Amino acid sequence: MSKVVNLVRPVVESIIDEHGDMLVNMEYIKEKSQNYLRIYVDREPNGIDIDEIAVLSELISEKLDTLDPDPLPDPYVLELSSPGAERPIKTKADWEKALNDYIHVGLYQKIEDKKMYEGTLKSYNDDEIILEVKDKTRRKTLTVPRKLIANIRFAIEF
């Protein structure tokens, strides 16, 4: 399935870039008996609106329909959306944006008897991240080795 993404990514990315938006993620997956090409798009600094998503969807759909040979020979559904407030942190730009933001971290193994933390990302490097987390009534700093991170995403603080 990722072969399709590799084939269409340059086309999709050029259309998105022309509009001043950024490609966050793209996936081609099969759910039940239906194929989906899902494209997640964002715009700095305030996010992308539904009207811009509709414009991009139309342009991308038209362009994909003209490609020869067709990288998507089977019927599929094209879905464009914003990545959402709690999107995964994947790219260098995501990491920069997450700095001093509230995030969720899921771990492969426990640190201090917990496999999940939410807190403010204070710093990061290739080996570890530093989180400021709530511990009952006080805040503390937690160092998390990156190799222990199963998933990491933006989070909404309540």
Swiss-Prot record:
> What organism is the protein native to?
Lactobacillus acidophilus (strain ATCC 700396 / NCK56 / N2 / NCFM)
Taxonomic lineage? Bacteria, Bacillati, Bacillota, Bacilli, Lactobacillales
Instruction: Name the chain's protein.
Output: Ribosome maturation factor RimP
Broad class of the protein's primary localization: cytoplasm
GO cellular-component term (any): cytosol
Q: What does this protein do?
A: Required for maturation of 30S ribosomal subunits.
Report the family membership: Belongs to the RimP family.
**Which sequence ranges are marked TM in the entry?**
none
From its record, what is one biological process in GO terms?
translation
Task: Specify one Pfam family.
Answer: RimP_N
Entries under NCBIfam families matching the protein = PRK00092.1-2
Where is it localised?
Cytoplasm
Sorted alphabetically, the keyword list is: Cytoplasm, Ribosome biogenesis
